[in-house]
């Protein structure tokens, strides 16, 4: 793994404060995180890098960065997190103020 891990991506520092990476699909694939964007709770997204392009996308001035998803997509991301990384789903629900669903 020669790409920048999403846990180490902290830019753009003027806007973003990483709280937790909730889903990391690995090299060359996507990662989702929860954090504070301009003092609002948001879901961030990025493409992890590869050996040939370790920074991934998006990037700015040679630094790996996060981009924010439309809030309308938060529930869809939560559904993916619940399937792929269930331990992080309740953290994400609590952080975003979404109701915790009871197990059947």
Language model feature labels by segment:
Residues 5-6, 37, 56, 85:
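Alpha-helical interaction segments
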Residues 20-24, 32, 61-63, 67:
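Generic preference for hydrophobic/aromatic residues in regular secondary structure cores
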């Amino acid at each position: 793994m020669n790409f920048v891990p999403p846990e180490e991506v902290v830019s753009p520092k003027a806007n973003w404060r990483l709280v937790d990476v909730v889903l990391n699909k690995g090299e060359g694939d996507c990662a989702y995180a929860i954090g504070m964007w301009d003092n609002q709770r948001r879901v961030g997204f990025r493409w992890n890098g590869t050996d040939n392009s370790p920074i991934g996308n998006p990037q700015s001035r040679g630094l790996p960065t996060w981009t924010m998803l439309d809030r309308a997509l938060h529930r869809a991301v939560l559904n993916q997190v619940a399937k792929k990384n269930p331990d992080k789903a309740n953290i994400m629900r609590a952080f975003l103020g979404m109701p915790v669903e009871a197990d059947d």
